[in-house]
């Protein structure tokens, strides 16, 4: 029995090593005495970190026990009793995969017996026991061979079966990361054997506290000594390089200590532990997050482990618990994903049998107090689970008796038993709220009871905040682990089954009702979900695809606003939860754990399909009920992509006099709206094939003061919150941008009380919308077009492709390209709209132009004025009408009176040089003697003075002007210090104040603008005016009128002599007049398309259609426009003369191109180049308009307009003029005139110098007989006729049509009375003589003018002679060229048969004109235009000689060919008559063609000489004449 003490010592040594692992505890130094009871006590014992075995994922940094006592009693059955008090352990986390952690737990529970057996059966057992086997007698019949293994195990089990352990006051400090610290306190742990292989573990008072970062900031304070530890990475067996451990220096120091001696290593080791423990967390605040009162575990340690666990009350704080969970389960990629250890392979198929029961689990967002009860539980949600029982083995089962959520004493969520209200049965509630069963092949979740809940806004905020924070933790780790290896595929597939009862919730006063959910084999079905008046039907789920059959809703604007107010705090809570700092432990958490948490919530592969959504939205007010229909909705992600196939929005417009209209509808059966998302943020919205219908009546829905007041109140109530919210978030994140792309969409324009309609088609539009903090939108329109139709009822729509119906049945009248539009608005600032464009093109006929104008006018809303527009005032009966009449008005011949009056006011007599352009001497003397006005005169007196000055200037004699004393420079006094004066000392030059009607000129009447529309620049606006008619109605009316005239002509008596003219006027522009029935078609052709050749095989219907090419083009270049809106007509408290809006239009260049084929001229209107180059930045036309409210008590507005136009050059062909007259005089009888025409308070147009070329083609003798004196102009060709359309100020004009008539009535008499010499000087035969006379005049005027400047006689005579020679020579050369061209035209008229042989399609009547300065070149069906011989002039003498040589050679070749053909014709002639006919036919060509070539060569040469002398003549000819290429 000598071995018994050694066994006792070894058992005692084993217990101490297993339970305490004391440092430097040697077996030989232990004195154990034999007896009935042995007891040892140790105090302040330090633990060896290298020998302590902790659960998986942790290693100990330091440890200490206050008191340890071990008592061994081998007799009496007391066994071994271990009591430990005051355990203090500091540990850190390390990485380990989930499989290894699970195996480690099972191994930790089972290895006690095996370790003890290994200790007893060691190789040096005999030596350590000091027993001689030969001397030891047999024990219990085992012989002398030694101690058997079975005996050792039996003894070991006997010892362990009587081992009791009591541990009190356990305090574990766990460091998860550099800034995460946890404290775990256990009041008492008791381990008791229960007989056999059963052991009971009792745990009392488990408490956990963590550090609250909100109390100390985002990072923990680190001392100087621990700085290195916080930045050093932790090296593990895992392949993850991203995870770090701040406590790796402890292990590193430990490894380095092995090369020293025992004493040195111990010293270095303890210093390393002290260094790594100095992290400065002692002062950090700790808060309770987890508490368990009792845990009772019964373990059967057999071959199959059985565990029975009973847990009492569990409390957990959800405020910091997510950080704790993610930190504690810090598992990485240590496992290589598929590799298993040999031990784990041997343990496959064995499962631990676990039975567990929990009395209650309570969780809340609030923290636990010092008494481990929840703080402020009455104001926070409490999640409660009770009566929890479960079992685990081959089949897992979990049963939750009661599941509910409370806030204080109010129940928020829970389950209720279904009650069968019958007479025979009693209500039978079911036992459990939640049943869960799981195995390796199946998972079943059953909710047998009906879920009920009443959620308020605070409840939703708390729940959403918690969920959002959890998701943000997962998302932050997903971003960090993006470069990790892909997720391994799950082995096998499990069968999941979910069965629920109904859900009946009250969400902020709105009912949410969900019918039972069924999920089986990956297929989920749900018949209906209702939320208020929103009903979702036919929900199914299969293979990550959610399908919804139909969604119906009927909601009103108050509900929408209520839901909006409901969502605002929830969204704020989500944002605040997302912005909470993510713990470093979560940032460094291993990916595998997050994969486990991620898998249930990952929705990247989820697809939601909704077949149809239909419902009504009551927006309230005048807008009323809007019907919305969405079809084919597909949501991917669901935060990646939303696709809607069809979008329809409609409204019943019966209250507006219309039927039900779809305001938004698809054009094609394709995808209409696609929303691309990223992390819940909109990345791109694409809209395709949608049509938006605009009805003028819809504007009435948004009018009214009540709606404005309501909108203002709503904006006022929501703006502060939103602005503050945006301002707070704007500092943290950049402003949100919503990109939008629109492809192949249409905007329908449907005017009021009109049958016409238009479609604005956009091909491609890109937009970017910034909703906050200030709304702004920038868009770019690649290309768009405007389609028009006169009668929308004639359209036959194609339901499957409306776009093709529009393109086929509508007429394109306008298009635009490369246009950018930006809109910005902010509180307190006006709404600004900036527009830039490349080219805008209008292509219309006469009827479509009127339809377009009428449609634009009809799109304006009908304004209901609250006040009267006019009022009647009674004037004083004794009004003196001659009070403001100047007496000198009737004394125009008195020059002294005129001179005295001309110095009084020069406001209306500006641009004197334009009035008398050649009287330069008078201009100098006039401005030299001018004096500022000292008095204010009336408008009538100014007009009288202007006419007086005109008479005076016309009556002035050149000699009297020359005799005037010239101005000497020494008489001008310069004041050197003028600009050094103070501002108040400088004289102020101001214009005389305008009349009382010019109320808008005062800056006091300009309120801050509300809307500013700025067209920065549109490069080109092209207006194409086509001949013919676009509408079938117009063509039918013309054909009907012609057929009626034919019928009338057939019915008239034949005996009438002479035949009576039959006439008719159609559309106020087509005048039909014919004597014979056969001439009617020709008359119609000439009226509609006079420029086209007459073809016998061309029908009247073809002549009435739109021409392929425009006859007139209007080019506007460099258009800039500024529209400023200051106030509305109905705005209250407007002073008299308040400017409502102003329009400023500037046009850099204006040109009208003549494409009429019978016209040889190019530009109908252009800038007068003879005036020289324009100033930099000068515009050709400048128009300013202001709408003012003259009387504050009347609902009326008046227009004040100012127009400035640069000098104009006109080349007017009578055919072109007739076309334009007919084009703009067209009146459609179906369109009504606007009910109220604009009243023009004041119209001011400044002097417009004009130089006119006019080519008449025919004379209307009937009009001449009726007294139209303007027909006399058709007898003369005008060439460079000069006139000035003088400045006119008109007041009180109704309508712009009357304005044009008034201007004509004033300008024409003025031109005839005062400017007739300049007009007559432009008569074609007289113009060369006038130009020669101008040269002679320069021989006198130029020397006199130069002499007056510097007094040098010889230089003045030289300049006069040079001007005379240059002018005279140039005019003589050009006059010779004109004679040569005229001769050529006469000779070509003789060779008329040649023209017919060259397939000339024009009749001789087309050549019968007063002028014949044109020939036929380049004529074809595609380009029907005549080219004048004045066109294509050579640039100089050398070019003129080259053109002369080629022209002469061309005509000589024609003559040569004619002579060669003549010889062949004579040889082929059978008779002398035929030969003579051939000679007569070829003689004109053979004889006259060389002469024509000679005249053309002479004209080309002379034109070259003239352009060499005056290079500007080439540009003038290019503006006037069409060119061949």
Curated annotation (Swiss-Prot):
One of the GO BP terms on file = autophagosome assembly
Where is it mainly found? membrane
**Biased composition, Polar residues: where in the chain?**
220-230
Compositionally skewed regions (Low complexity) per UniProt? 716-733
Q: How does it sit in the membrane?
A: Peripheral membrane protein
Q: Which GO terms describe its molecular function?
A: phosphatidylinositol-3-phosphate binding; protein-membrane adaptor activity
Instruction: Give yes or no: UniProt keyword Transport.
Output: yes
Q: Where in the cell is it found?
A: Preautophagosomal structure membrane; Endoplasmic reticulum membrane
The GO cellular component terms are: endoplasmic reticulum membrane; phagophore; phagophore assembly site; phagophore assembly site membrane
Q: Which UniProt keywords apply?
A: Autophagy, Endoplasmic reticulum, Lipid transport, Membrane, Protein transport, Transport
Residue ranges for the region (Disordered) are: 216-247, 712-738
Pfam families per the UniProt record, alphabetical: ATG2_CAD
Look up keyword NAD and say if it applies: no
PANTHER family, per the entry: AUTOPHAGY-RELATED 2, ISOFORM A
State the similarity comment. Answer: Belongs to the ATG2 family.
Protein name, UniProt field: Autophagy-related protein 2
Which species is listed as the source?
Yarrowia lipolytica (strain CLIB 122 / E 150)
Q: What is the lineage of its organism?
A: Eukaryota, Fungi, Dikarya, Ascomycota, Saccharomycotina
